[in-house]
């Protein structure tokens, strides 16, 4: 798994905000294979439902925690277009790994990366994702540069509200 290939120079924490799937039990084997041990079932402060540790490294699992955790990230890993764009808008560089689903194919990831100025880096394999993740975690200046490019491309917060107001005004006039 990719986590076994992740070797940053300092201790790390991985925040895993989950949707309805996968189930926590589905992730358990990969964590155990990589010598992580479950240390807690719930943490109010962070909002994790499960916490796993391996020495000074931690994995936090939480269902529905994306909004809360996204701004804490140094690097994002995503396989969904909207989550990727939300992270980029927060100034977080993202590694994308196209999945098996119809909504996120390699061609989409490449176009998305181009539109977002390279702040999203599409990866074709788990190995290339781990290699790029290690690089970004160890190179703060590159992370900051990519984060700045991404947040500039996405623009400031509030775009959806402004667009809704414009549409509402247009509809009132017609």
Describe each model-derived feature in a short phrase.
Residues 1-174:
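Nucleotide-activated sugar donor-binding and catalytic core shared by glycosyltransferases
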């Amino acid at each position: 798994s990719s986590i076994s290939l992740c070797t940053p120079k300092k201790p790390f924490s991985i925040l895993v905000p989950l949707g309805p799937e996968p189930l926590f039990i589905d992730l358990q084997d990969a964590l155990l294979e990589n010598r992580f041990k479950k240390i807690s079932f719930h943490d109010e402060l962070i909002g994790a439902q499960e916490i796993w540790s391996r020495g000074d490294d931690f994995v936090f699992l939480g269902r529905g925690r994306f909004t809360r955790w996204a701004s804490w990230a140094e690097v994002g890993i995503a396989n969904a277009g909207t989550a990727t764009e939300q992270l980029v808008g927060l100034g977080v560089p993202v590694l994308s790994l196209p999945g098996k689903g119809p909504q996120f194919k390699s061609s989409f990831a490449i176009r998305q990366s181009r539109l977002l100025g390279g702040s999203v880096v599409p990866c074709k394999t788990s190995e290339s994702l781990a290699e790029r993740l290690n690089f970004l975690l160890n190179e703060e200046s590159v992370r900051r540069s990519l984060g700045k490019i991404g947040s500039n491309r996405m623009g400031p917060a509030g775009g959806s509200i402004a667009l809704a107001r414009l549409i509402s005004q247009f509809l009132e006039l017609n």
